[in-house]
């Protein structure tokens, strides 16, 4: 079980049960984590978050006695590559040029999102220093000399065979309704295929119906679900 160094907005603590973790003693482990987290330091009404990766149907019942209740599902979808050719002409992200416009569009598009919506200059700088960060795979699409959308990809070389992820994708709300979401996704997926990747992957909220419909049309299918639970002090 991994404790987050920086819990997301609205939570004082967040920890994750990683994929493949033995469920046998999970209830006891969570209870012990709560006991050692010095809950007395938190105020009444504060909330703690728990993620279970690749969640199973009975996980909610399994940990019910700990006081955690499910509230959010993040589904992982996968699709074979390549996909249909994108109609958009994109360009790569340019360091020292595109940071401000990217962060502005990201903030507008993900204002509702508890993790991606909090991305700021400092956090973005940390991500740019990650070994997987690839400027060529960070695609931007512009309209009227303005950033209209982006598709940020990530290649998981530790997977066998390597897996290509749409790490983050967004269209500026000012350009919604123009049918840009699907071709933006296709552009990212086909970049990954050009790098030799045979399977594309992304995560999406289970209640984001428009996005799910778009991804289904592209060829994505459900692979697993990460489920979030919360506990109120």
Where in the sequence are the language-model features?
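Active-site/acyl-donor-binding loops of N-acyltransferases
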Residues: 64-85, 186, 194-233
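Conserved hydrophobic beta-strand within the GNAT/NAT acetyltransferase core sheet
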Residues: 48-52, 166, 200-204
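A conserved beta-strand-loop-helix scaffold within acyl/acetyltransferase catalytic domains
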Residues: 1-8, 115-169
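Conserved acetyl-CoA binding element of GNAT-fold acetyltransferases
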Residues: 8-27, 162-173
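Acyl-donor-binding surface of acyltransferase catalytic domains
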Residues: 7, 17-89, 229-231
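Short, high-confidence coil segments that cap the C-terminus of an alpha-helix
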Residues: 43-45, 136, 197
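Conserved acetyl-CoA-binding loop-helix of GNAT-fold acetyltransferases
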Residues: 22-39, 168-171, 177-194, 212-217
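A short beta-loop-alpha structural element at the N-terminal edge
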Residues: 89-104
């Amino acid at each position: 079980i991994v404790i987050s160094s920086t819990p997301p907005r609205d939570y004082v603590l967040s920890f994750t049960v990683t994929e493949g973790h033995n469920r046998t003693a999970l209830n006891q482990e969570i209870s012990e984590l709560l006991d050692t987290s010095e809950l007395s330091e938190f105020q009444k009404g504060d909330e703690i978050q728990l993620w279970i990766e690749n969640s199973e149907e009975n996980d909610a019942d399994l940990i019910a006695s700990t006081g955690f209740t499910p509230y959010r599902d993040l589904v992982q979808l996968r699709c074979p590559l390549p996909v249909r050719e994108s109609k958009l002409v994109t360009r790569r992200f340019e360091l020292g040029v595109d940071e401000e416009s990217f962060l502005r569009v990201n903030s507008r598009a993900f204002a509702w999102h508890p993790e991606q919506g909090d991305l700021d200059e400092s956090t973005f700088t940390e991500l740019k220093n990650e070994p997987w960060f690839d400027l060529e795979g960070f695609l931007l699409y512009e309209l009227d000399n303005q950033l209209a959308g982006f598709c940020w990809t990530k290649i998981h070389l530790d997977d066998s065979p390597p897996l290509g992820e749409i790490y983050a994708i967004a269209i500026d709300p000012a350009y919604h309704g123009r049918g840009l979401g699907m071709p933006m996704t296709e552009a990212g997926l086909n970049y990954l295929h050009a790098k030799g990747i045979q399977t594309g992957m992304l995560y999406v909220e289970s209640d984001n119906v428009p996005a799910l419909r778009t991804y289904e049309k592209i060829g994505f299918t459900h692979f697993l679900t990460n489920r979030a639970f919360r506990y109120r002090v």
